[in-house]
Design a protein with these regions (language model features):
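Beta-strand-loop-alpha-helix segment that lines the small-molecule cofactor/substrate pocket
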Residues: 91-147
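Rossmann-like dinucleotide-binding domain that binds NAD(P)(H)
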Residues: 182-257, 263, 327-330
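Conserved N-terminal Rossmann-fold NAD(P) cofactor-binding segment
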Residues: 51-85
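Short active-site oxyanion
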Residues: 41-45, 65, 90-92, 194-195, ...
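NAD(P)-dinucleotide binding in Rossmann-like oxidoreductases
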Residues: 228-235, 243-312, 318-327
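C-terminal helix-rich "cap/oligomerization" subdomain common to oxidoreductases
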Residues: 1-13, 91, 129, 312-343
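A contiguous active-site-proximal alpha/beta segment in oxidoreductase catalytic domains
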Residues: 122-181
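N-terminal Rossmann-like dinucleotide-binding module
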Residues: 1-63
Length: 343
């Protein structure tokens, strides 16, 4: 017997997966644009707080307005519940602010809807355990949308390191910088869910988690705080840590000129990956002086890989991703917790 998602048996790759989105903002627009290129997928519903935004989203992506849900008075809650209850929706792309992920992911899973949840999926390891428990209890797929793992460059990097050509990994450095400006998104200024570690640092943590086994130990964290109503948020982080004994230097900065790279130092050379959150270009520098450029373009765009992968998992009746597993989401949350709890 196949796995039942919503009201249909989806262990049949001839059946389209019918997606709905929770949150009709910029990220959902990017998801919807990529989904149009995915075989076996349809976007059939959208929910948000603002009626005008939901109406615009439905028009932009040819969604029947009967499946466009909005409720401004309760921060969108009635709209999100209505979409989750929609019998014509099989799977949900969860693009609400980070702090709302756990609640709405669990509600969707309990309703039998598969969930693709934007990064960071959770704000703590405790929240990760809660989602994993519900996913396993209900037998419904949950996957964190850690898009860099689904870019073709990611597999190339893993293959190169696994080949042993560069030897073992000696250390890793990540640098992520951008200028948030004076008026960033409101969730970035929320003391409970804002700051640059959650927003961009989670991408670097995703690389660390995937490349290195073993325990995480954070030796130091220097933070530049920004005062906001109700507290403060980290506007820059400089972290020294190790995983499995491999030293890591991690930099996130929301008040700097753009830079994004991951440098993996190995015994016989190094691998520098540009734009670590959406990688297409890397340089291999060998100890003998040779430098090789690796160019691995996206298939369609940087969202397509994760969206296509999730759709295929749902069609196949899988309960988790082999690329971004439930254990990986929990371990990423554990690493971020360790960083955040370092004085």
């Amino acid at each position: 017997m196949g796995v039942i998602v919503g009201d249909r048996d989806l262990c049949d790759d001839s059946r389209d997966v019918r997606w709905g989105v929770l949150g009709a903002g910029h990220i959902s627009h990017r998801f919807a644009s990529s989904l149009k290129e995915v075989d076996g997928a349809q976007l059939v519903a959208a929910a948000g707080r603002t009626p005008a935004h939901v109406e615009e989203f439905c028009r932009a992506f040819s969604i029947d307005t009967a499946h466009g849900y909005a409720s401004a008075d309760d921060n969108g809650c009635a709209a999100y519940d209505a979409l989750i209850a929609d019998p014509d929706v099989d799977a949900i792309y969860l693009a609400l602010p980070h702090g709302m992920h756990t609640h709405w992911a669990c509600r969707a899973l309990r309703a039998g809807k598969a969930v693709l949840c934007e990064k960071p999926a959770v704000l703590s390891e405790e929240e990760a355990h809660a989602i994993v428990s519900v996913s396993c209890e209900c037998g419904v797929l949950f996957m964190e949308a850690m898009k860099n793992r689904f870019c073709p460059m990611h597999a190339r990097v893993k293959d190169l390191l696994a080949s042993g050509e560069l030897g073992r990994v000696v250390s890793i450095e990540s640098v992520q910088k951008l200028d948030y400006g004076e008026s960033p998104s409101s969730y970035l200024l929320d003391p409970l869910q804002g700051g640059c570690l959650y927003d961009m640092g989670c991408y670097a943590v995703g690389w660390f988690e995937d490349l290195l086994a073993g325990a995480c130990d954070v030796s130091s964290r220097e933070v530049r705080w920004r005062d906001v109503p109700g507290g403060n948020v980290d506007w820059a982080d400089d972290v020294h840590m190790s995983i499995g004994g491999v030293p890591i230097h991690m930099v996130c900065d929301g008040m700097a000129e753009y830079e994004s790279r991951l440098t993996i130092i190995c015994e016989r050379g190094s691998l520098e990956i540009e734009r670590l959150h959406r990688p297409e270009l890397a340089h291999v520098k060998y100890s003998d002086g040779r430098v090789i450029e690796i160019d691995v373009p996206f298939e369609v765009d940087d969202f397509y890989g994760e969206v296509s992968h999730a759709t295929q998992l749902i069609q196949a009746g899988k309960l988790e991703s082999p690329v971004m597993s439930l254990a990986a989401t929990q371990r990423c949350a554990h690493i971020i917790d360790a960083i955040r709890m370092t004085p």
